[in-house]
């Protein structure tokens, strides 16, 4: 099928105006050939040749009229649920904003979260975000990305409003990048800042430290139930699905036991592009957290990353002194209530998108 740009130029002398609507709230007026008048109602579609938004008149063989030059506005672009088939488009959208590919992170998100997006009429995605549910009482919003060409047009507000509606009565939280334009938007929607999360990364340089009473070992299948129980207490909700997917992805999962053999903490280490990410990191105290980080990071020759909450300043200083230097921060924001659980024992999240 031929793109209509040339065809329209030949038929200018035989045109009349015809109204159609891409959405109930966005009428548009186009000039159409007289031969097509009264024969069909214009129907929006995507051109198979150039992927621009178009209107098909009469039949595919008669006319395809391009409307790419019309400003449809954010209200004319519907929000849809994304699937694994959209993963490549999400990675491409993130790259538009300078984000690294992070294939493992995206696969994890699509496995445990609900992804929503707005299509770019010219192809690809104009915006997307994910919602991760932890039961009915808690949910996380992450990877809110709007293509640079669609910036400042309200797509982010529409997406966030949609995610809050989907979350229902749940407390919703997110980590807003320090360089993000999103924080004023989130504040206007009722989010409030409660903490910071700082990304520490680099080559880990271990130092001698006092031995931890108890033991440290690789996790086994028999540890899953005790780990899940500890995590529910600390996190304040059941994130068993996230942990199950993550442990399948992780290179190492370690558990720490106290002197009586009780579970004192655990950590997972998973590969995200060039970094070995440590998270989640759940520990009874600072000493256990340090021991778990050391055990994981000391065996890695490349870059190690751990995201540390602002409330754990002593751990952050300890990590920086061993080569894991601060290299970016985010503001932890919450909507609809307070975060549940014993958060002082949650030293590092799985990721900023999931918590």
Residue ranges and their predicted role:
Residues 1-12, 31-41:
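Polybasic, low-complexity intrinsically disordered segments
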Residues 3-5, 36, 47-50, 58:
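Cysteine-centered motifs
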Residues 59-76, 83-88, 108, 119-121, ...:
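Intrinsically disordered, low-complexity, positively biased terminal segments
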Residues 141, 173-178, 306:
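Conserved hydrophobic beta-strand within the GNAT/NAT acetyltransferase core sheet
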Residues 171-177, 192-206, 326-338:
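Conserved catalytic-core motifs of GNAT/GCN5-like acyltransferases
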Residues 186-187, 191, 319:
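Conserved active-site tyrosine of GNAT-family acetyltransferases
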Residues 199-225, 230-231:
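Surface-exposed beta-loop interaction hotspot
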